[in-house]
């Protein structure tokens, strides 16, 4: 029997303590909220691990219109224009709010913000905090601010397991703790659970991030969008470390070059060269590796002895792997870094389920389209966290009726899913691989064991990917290498995806026979 935490009834429940979750809670204050986090506050979040900064058009030669144009170009036809225009327009205000919360951004000698350059940006507009340690330097003061705010309660070591419904409305959240399961009664829940990198062997995300928020929302009947678009960062440090360490795009922004084992600069003739959009660079590196080669970043001439001063975190990670980036080539490979798909929301973070908001990487707002522009993720997390808070503040708490019964849920474990997703749902895809993934994932989902929730999320990626018969953005198919003339986003519910998956099983068995 689960304990109902009646003393917390009526509080807004926020699941996750990355940038999106923290900004939601701080913006809602003094409205009573409770943050549910499986780890320590702000810990084990992609936000805290971010090396890149926040994209904001703060330079004299820049504008929101230019930032929007770069965002749309990277998004490859699938961006929601209204959402993208409004988010980039609010970037400067988000920087101001973060500074007000205690974040100290890097400045130049004149006292103005230092602006970095990253791939597919036409201007220097990346705002950093403590260089390539931006994520931690942003999350730390926000977590401190949350700890100082009396209206925010934090439940650490608490794993969200199921959303509870009263009809089709949110009624509460079932969570697992060391002491057993508990229920938080609430008609207003925000999911800020991060991405899906933990579904893959090679990822830069915390390994526990397997798309829990997507699984929660999907089981509650929420609309999902663009699940097929998984961004592989081109330059993860190729080492034995797990998760893989990131070698930020900013290193290429400062002039580092990509070369293969023959010292050939294979990106030289590509539009944008080393600073082409991430999907383009990831595919090029994957092709080099697929032919049996290796790929390296060469920062020796561009940075040399200045590398450690510019990128202290990356320098330390390289040295941990036995590489001196001032003298040595840095071995790199693509790794899952960001998910453009997720729970479909409007411009305020509202999902299709009444009482449920989703912000940050767990959401699919349409900002990123088919391929995220570098450093737009922290921007979206900050802006959408604030927006959702303002939207929620206008919604009165209702007395939802908790269901009498709820299924027993076991702790999730994505280990059985990782080899399937890594093999079949990688940088390059085809029909046989995707149907193979569906055939392997359905039994794990139906088994209702530890792999069920991770399998659900991977299954959604496979189904969405199988339906997109083109190559666009981060979704590249060897059997459909061309882009269709008309770009179209796709949404569906879990029930729809399961119907499609079950109908695909005979095909996959026939292919493997």
State where each predicted segment sits:
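Glycine- and aromatic-enriched mobile tails/lids
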Residues: 1-11, 27, 40-42, 50-56, ...
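FAD-site-proximal beta/loop scaffold in flavoenzymes
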Residues: 162-172, 176-178, 323-367
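Short beta-strand to alpha-helix junction loop
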Residues: 79-92, 126-144, 155, 203-211, ...
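N-terminal Rossmann-like FAD-binding beta1-loop-alpha1 element of flavoenzymes
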Residues: 11-35
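An anion/pyrophosphate-binding glycine-rich loop and adjacent beta-alpha core
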Residues: 216, 222-330, 382, 391-393, ...
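Conserved redox-cofactor binding core of oxidoreductases
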Residues: 99-180, 192, 201, 236-238, ...
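Short hydrophobic core segments
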Residues: 13-15, 184-193
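Conserved N-terminal glycine-rich FAD pyrophosphate-binding loop of Rossmann-like flavoproteins
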Residues: 39-72, 76, 242-245
